[in-house]
Amino acid sequence: MGITSVLTKDNVKKIDTDIDVQERDLNVFITSASRVIAPLWPISTFAARNPWMGLENQPFDQVASWLKNTRDVDIYPSASMIRSAKNKGEIDEDFVEMGLQRWLDSHSYHIPRDVAERFCHAALKLDPLPSDLLSSHELEKLVSECSGLDHIENVFMQPLSSYIENQDGERLVNILDHHVIKWSKLYLDDSQAGWTMPNREEGFYRAWQHLIQYDPALSKKQRERVKGWPKEAHLALQEALFALEIPESEIQTYLEGHLLSLPGWAGMMLWRSQQSSHEHALLTEYLAVRISMEWALIKPYLPLTNERSKKTISIAPLIAAWIHWGGLTLEEWSQMTASEQNEYLSFAYSFDEKLRKKLWLEAWEQTYTDRLSQKIISKQRETGREKSALAQLAFCIDVRSEPFRRQLEKEGPFETIGIAGFFGVPIATCELGSKHSHASLPIIQKPQNKIKEFADEDVFKKYNQRKQAIHSLSHTFKTMKQNALSSLLLPELSGPWLTLQMAARSFVPRKAGRFIRNLREAWLRKPDTKLSLHHDATEAEIPVGFTDEEKVNYARQALKMMGLTENIAPLVVICGHGSQSTNNPYSAALDCGACGGAAGGFNARVLAALCNLSEVREALLAEGIKIPEDTVFAAAEHNTTVDELHWLYVPELSEAAQEAFEQIEAVMPKVRHHVNAERLAQLPNFQSKLKNPKAEANRFAEDWSEIRPEWGLARNAAFIIGKRELTQDCDLEGRAFLHNYDWKQDESGELLANIIVGPGTVAQWINLQYYASTVAPHYYGSGNKATQTVTAGLGVMQGNASDLLAGLPWQSVMESDHEAYHSPLRLLILIQAPREYVERLLNHDSAFLQKVQNGWVRLASLDPEGCWESW
């Protein structure tokens, strides 16, 4: 046996073996511990998740220190990222200096200011200390003569298995992880495996308990250790904690350590527990399985020495830092008094790598903020320049909409609007012939209504038969592939067709993809459909359709959010957005985050149809919102991969609306060409001068070997809430979420509050997902797409036994193996409104205030006089 950490009495209170852990109610401990992970939903509906959503009650830098101490995870940008940003001119070093001076002013050290500044300036270059200095005998001698720091770091309680190695030198926690991954995959499988886990209906813990006695990966003695274990998960967890002698005061921290060992699988268990009352205790069951397995594995090594050391600070790097960065000689150091040495050591310890990276990150963020403010303020439009729009097009706030909107406005008398892509209709959508519905709204909300597609009975019956034929063929193929006997015959039966498909997909992907898609559409011949907008009295968990009051409420709310309560154009187009890619497990990550990881076209159709209802218009007119008689609402979907606008719902148009429609159609090829060229030029190794942008965009969408069909929301950095005139003349480089807002129409502040709670939260989650996947890809990302394995129908792993990877793949944030494309900046929220509006928002929304104060988002405002203020 090997102990990988020295255990001392000083770190942990003496274990009181009289504590009867079995009598403790673990619910509070588990609920509190679960804050260190975030729910993880299936990849088929991939929506952004903030990995630190449960930790926002703590400052960002404290969480950074905690993660570094507990998991050795650094959530600040690496030195190489910072150098690259500096070399590209993305960081103004004046802001680094300002941050340094503020830090020096706020700390009191008995060190000359010029000496401290010289040390800090050299250390901020982020160069590593020379290895020959660290290993020198002279330094070793100085260390032996030094009394050291009067400071000891805390060590957080880790799983006991992390301290033990087996005879082969492998840590037992790694073996434990392997077992837990295996059982988690079996239980959570979503119809991918041919055989389901026996006794699954009894719950995770009970199913595991039935099968563990037959696990060949465990020895007979290990299986016997849990043979008589309690049949209830919470009792088993209590039993395991008691057997491991975990002190009551350390239980929560101990559970946190186990949850953080496999945050992906634990996050999926947490999400499942929140979705179903049947699985409400699933996280408890997960911990019961994991810690019971730990007990079975480490029993022969117990009891461990009742000592776990505090992590004492190594002073060698601190002395070396003063010699290398501070310019001190070995002789000068040896001549210092003990108190002087302690003062210098304390200073070097405080100005550690984390603080240095923090100063660089804040300077990076301030540089972006400063340049954005200059760009916006310098290009403010003069009053009265606005012309009446022939058409108004409402797009999702998604950063990919910004270049498309900018180019569209250049080509004609069009006004574009930004709004969350579910358009304020909290619905579950059910497509024609489907038995399943999708919650097409932000993950943080629950659907209030279900809207179904339907068609005439005779037409639908024939369509459904054609659809079932395709489904049956696909199901038969999958069944044969998973069956032990029929899988031997499958290559002979399917080989010719699959060979032809593989060759076509590989050598002519664009033509092959178009041919297969056209063939499928020609066979299905999906009929024209209608939507179940009207309330169905049939009782259901979620009501089908809307009541008359709901129709008016949702239409009114959306129009106010878009600022369309007056001066409404003849044609208003509600534009959802989606993406197009082939052989891409992360396709949902490229769709609309505000629609729960699906395309937003369905929601666009619903809102457009509501706004065309005569009874809705009459009710709105009574409230002072007049929609002109010749105004028509239509719906379209913006394909962000090929930058194409696809019409979904175009009712009978008035003469003025028809003119607007034709003009949009006329300019769309030019818009698409320019946006494709702008977007594709940012992809690595793309030669824009040598290739047709439209053809190349289509190839990216159809090529099944393409690991980066588009950049998605990479480089997102700002969320701007204000009138379109604020940013209309600005090239925001596809980095800003844009939400329309007119403070003059929001006296109560309710609209602003709703934007922050809904779209603002979604944007922040997206931002932090990209941030985390960039700065800590090994822990919060999902690795290389080319080596990923889709598992259990839920997510991806690297290989066949890793954590369930929760973040974005390498190709979504990295330009190359050594160069990041995404700039890891925390989201800047800019509000165009008087100062008192922002003050009221912060006073009423304590959760948002907490995010701002703790550094999870940055906040700025622009008042009517054009004064920019950072909060």
Curated annotation (Swiss-Prot):
Species assigned in the record: Bacillus subtilis (strain 168)
Assigned keywords, A-Z: Cell membrane, Membrane, Metal-binding, Transport, Zinc
Function statement: Part of an energy-coupled inorganic carbon pump.
Family: Belongs to the inorganic carbon transporter (TC 9.A.2) DabA family.
Assembly and interaction partners: Forms a complex with DabB.
Compartment annotation: Cell membrane
Keyword Transport: yes
Gene name, Swiss-Prot/TrEMBL: dabA
Pfam families cross-referenced by the UniProt entry: DabA
UniProt-recorded name of the protein: Probable inorganic carbon transporter subunit DabA
GO molecular function: zinc ion binding
Cofactor(s) listed in the protein's UniProt record: Zn(2+)
Record membrane topology: Peripheral membrane protein
